[in-house]
Amino acid sequence: MRSDTITQGFERTPHRALLKGSGVPQSQMDKPFIGVATSFTDLIPGHVGMRDLERFIEKGVHTGGGHAFFFGLPGVCDGIAMGHKGMHYSLPTRELIADMVESVAEAHRLDGLVLLTNCDKITPGMLMAAARLDIPCIVVTAGPMMSGRGQEGRKFSFVTDTFEAMARYKAGVISERELMVCEENACPGIGSCQGLFTANTMAILTETMGMSLPRCGTALAVSALKRRIAFASGEKIVELVQNNITPRSILTREAFENAIRVDLALGGSSNTVLHLLAIANEAGVELPLETFDILAKETPQLASMNPAGEHFMEDLDVAGGVSGVMKQLGDKIKDTQTLFGLTTRQLAASVENVDETVIRPLTNPVKKEGGIAVLFGNIAPKGAVVKQSGVSDKMMKFEGTARCFDSEELAMAALMEGEIVAGNVVVIRYEGPKGGPGMREMLAPTAALMGLGLGDSVALITDGRFSGGTRGPCIGHISPEAAQGGPIGLIQDGDRISLDIPARRLELLVDEAVLQARAATWVAPPPKIAKGWLARYAKVVTSAHTGAVTTAE
């Protein structure tokens, strides 16, 4: 075992002495050393419940014959970080988490890892570390929050009843009292936000790829099932160490394709494009951006999930969960291995009944194409991403007049002051991985568009990204970004922009000669942040079309 490096032989007397100083008895020195990477924090609801799950994981590890060691990782909530300087740090924490897991596992020669995670960037960061290390690992996602409940059976959700409600209040659609009712009921307890936002989408894809146990991706944070999954995961990691089953044997090209298909079938978060590209990069799997669009054209959307639809994670769980989605997808799902022994098709076959009011059959889809589309054009030569499951039929094709803003704050101010009108295309730039830095989520302006009733008359494009809670005609991940001299930085107020999602095109209707003249006079703006971690990050992060990963160069 890897841990023999620090536990065996007289040369390791100092190492054993330190371990004994931590309370490890001699009898445990020949047991598998299992690291439990926990992102517990009492700052955010998605991670508050992890102390309980830690206990059950530890019990499982010891029952399985291993010895558990806890170490901590940061957990950032995109909702709390939204709309201010804090959002610059969200995506970069994905890289920090991957590096921290790698550092602890290698420094202390851990034999295997249980990765306890939940919210947006923590899960992909841990999966990146698992693929990079390629030692036995299992993921436990802490589970989604229940929907909020109100009178007359009303269900509340975080994005619809906070960010969008804020704009409805500003527009005079709801009263201050109604806004407070939303605030009090939107988040009723622990767990990741209730809809198919980034955290829950990543939990589902982790299960789809076979890196977590069945139903881990959908079991509610408050459920006893989640505790049992935590215990079983602790037991399982010891078995994985004994059999040397490692992530790269699970994270194959076919497993990534299955994850993309499930993502498309559910209409998941556009952030998953960034994260799957980054995880595949660590796993040594070639996964071009175009793969998402190729699969989208042949994978129907089978569920209508919040925020764009009516169903919540609690509905998906009882309807059949991830295995139920794979069952409905049939032969579109490839038969891949999971870390718990069963193949994906065996899991799908194990589901006896699927609630087809939630997860529809292929013969009766919500939409003929999957939830994510990749666009190209002279604004996005290397690609852009749209969550087409959240776009109304009316806005699938649109032409409008550009209103340009060099930051999210400037765009948000214009929206709240009523300066954006029907027929506009809001352009938010210098918010990419380098230019932001950190590729901030534009949830506040996109939610404002919907709350102000502009979702069917105004489009938004950006080199930043969007929350999993975003809906509406919002195109992000535009590559190359403005800070790298991308064409989005050449757009001027009054230019006409054409959006054609069915044709996968995003075009600036300006003569090429005019664009070349603008490019000749373009000057890169100074960095927005010139010191600290983000300044270093901006120098080494790649473009969105490659997953916004950091490089050694």
Curated annotation (Swiss-Prot):
Keywords (alphabetical) are: 2Fe-2S, Amino-acid biosynthesis, Branched-chain amino acid biosynthesis, Iron, Iron-sulfur, Lyase, Magnesium, Metal-binding
Q: Hey, which pathway is this one from?
A: Amino-acid biosynthesis; L-isoleucine biosynthesis; L-isoleucine from 2-oxobutanoate: step 3/4; Amino-acid biosynthesis; L-valine biosynthesis; L-valine from pyruvate: step 3/4
> Which Enzyme Commission number(s) are on file for it?
4.2.1.9
Among InterPro entries, the record links this protein to: Dihydro-acid_dehy_C, DihydroxyA_deHydtase, DiOHA_6PGluconate_deHydtase_CS, ILV_EDD_C, ILV_EDD_N, IlvD/EDD_N
Q: GO:BP terms for this protein?
A: isoleucine biosynthetic process; L-valine biosynthetic process
* Reactions mediated catalytically: (2R)-2,3-dihydroxy-3-methylbutanoate = 3-methyl-2-oxobutanoate + H2O; (2R,3R)-2,3-dihydroxy-3-methylpentanoate = (S)-3-methyl-2-oxopentanoate + H2O
Binding of [2Fe-2S] cluster: at which residues? 119, 193
Residues binding Mg(2+), per UniProt = 78, 120-121, 441
Top-rank taxon of the source lineage equals: Bacteria
Query: GO molecular-function annotation terms?
Result: 2 iron, 2 sulfur cluster binding; dihydroxy-acid dehydratase activity; magnesium ion binding
What does the record say about how the cofactor binds? Binds 1 [2Fe-2S] cluster per subunit. This cluster acts as a Lewis acid cofactor.
Q: Which PANTHER family match?
A: D-XYLONATE DEHYDRATASE, D-XYLONATE DEHYDRATASE YAGF-RELATED
State the family it belongs to: Belongs to the IlvD/Edd family.
Question: What's this chain's function?
Answer: Functions in the biosynthesis of branched-chain amino acids. Catalyzes the dehydration of (2R,3R)-2,3-dihydroxy-3-methylpentanoate (2,3-dihydroxy-3-methylvalerate) into 2-oxo-3-methylpentanoate (2-oxo-3-methylvalerate) and of (2R)-2,3-dihydroxy-3-methylbutanoate (2,3-dihydroxyisovalerate) into 2-oxo-3-methylbutanoate (2-oxoisovalerate), the penultimate precursor to L-isoleucine and L-valine, respectively.
Name the UniProt record assigns to this protein = Dihydroxy-acid dehydratase
Gene responsible for this protein: ilvD
